[in-house]
């Protein structure tokens, strides 16, 4: 990493949270000087020997869990499109705001090439029958539409997102581990 110290925003980690943080910042305030620091590699350099050898060789850093897009880069890529699953965001922001943000995130994935098909909402008759059986068994069925990215398409989507951030002026320092966050007068002022 060079010695430049005049960044407006420093984002630690290039997983989905870091990616979407940078995306929103450049959309809302394109003049910001943004640095993203990631301990792993760029997406195009994330290669795991285990794919061919079938044995983990203990790479440091691990290309499966670190690098641009984080652990999700090589996952099956299923996006849950309901606030009813996945955590307590609705409790924090309210149900409607959580749903709005899920749709906003989904729109970004669509913009960068996600398949438009959504699974789980087209078989209402079958869903009603499963719901009836669940109630009879004292269970609650939670409907959750799913957008399936797929491993290969997810990789392409994240590659396009990486290119978008770079071409929009976000500086990404790969293979860089943050050791500490500098605090001055109670505010984050930099990183080591």
Please provide the spans of the model-predicted regions.
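Short beta-strand "acidic-cap" motif of Rossmann-like dinucleotide-binding folds
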Residues: 31-38, 43
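Short alpha-helical segment within the catalytic ATP-binding CA
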Residues: 20
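Beta1/beta-strand and adjacent pyrophosphate-binding region of the FAD-binding site
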Residues: 2-17, 35-37
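A general beta-strand register signal
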Residues: 73-74, 173, 192
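General beta-strand structural signal in soluble alpha/beta enzymes
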Residues: 36-38, 82, 143, 172-175
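Aromatic pocket-lining residues of Rossmann-like dinucleotide-binding sites
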Residues: 24-25
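A conserved short coil-to-beta-strand element within the FAD-binding core of flavoproteins
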Residues: 174-187
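Conserved N-terminal/central alpha/beta ligand/cofactor-binding core
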Residues: 42-46, 50-168
């Amino acid at each position: 990493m060079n010695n430049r110290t005049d960044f407006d925003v420093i984002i630690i980690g290039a997983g989905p949270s870091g990616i979407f943080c940078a995306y929103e910042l450049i959309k809302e305030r394109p003049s910001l000087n943004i640095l993203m620091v990631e301990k792993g590699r760029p997406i195009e350099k994330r290669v795991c020997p285990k794919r061919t050898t079938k044995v983990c060789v203990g790479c440091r850093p691990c290309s499966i869990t670190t690098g641009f897009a984080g652990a999700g880069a090589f996952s099956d890529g299923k996006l849950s499109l309901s606030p009813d699953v996945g955590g307590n965001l609705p409790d924090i922001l309210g149900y409607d705001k959580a749903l709005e943000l899920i749709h906003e995130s989904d729109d970004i994935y669509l913009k960068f090439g996600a398949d438009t098909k959504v699974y789980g909402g087209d078989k209402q008759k079958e869903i009603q029958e499963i719901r009836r059986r669940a109630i009879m068994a004292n269970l609650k069925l939670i409907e959750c539409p799913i957008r399936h990215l797929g491993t290969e398409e997810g990789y392409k989507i994240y590659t396009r997102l990486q290119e978008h951030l770079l071409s929009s002026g976000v500086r990404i320092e790969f293979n860089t581990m943050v050791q500490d966050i500098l605090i001055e007068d109670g505010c984050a002022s930099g990183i080591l």
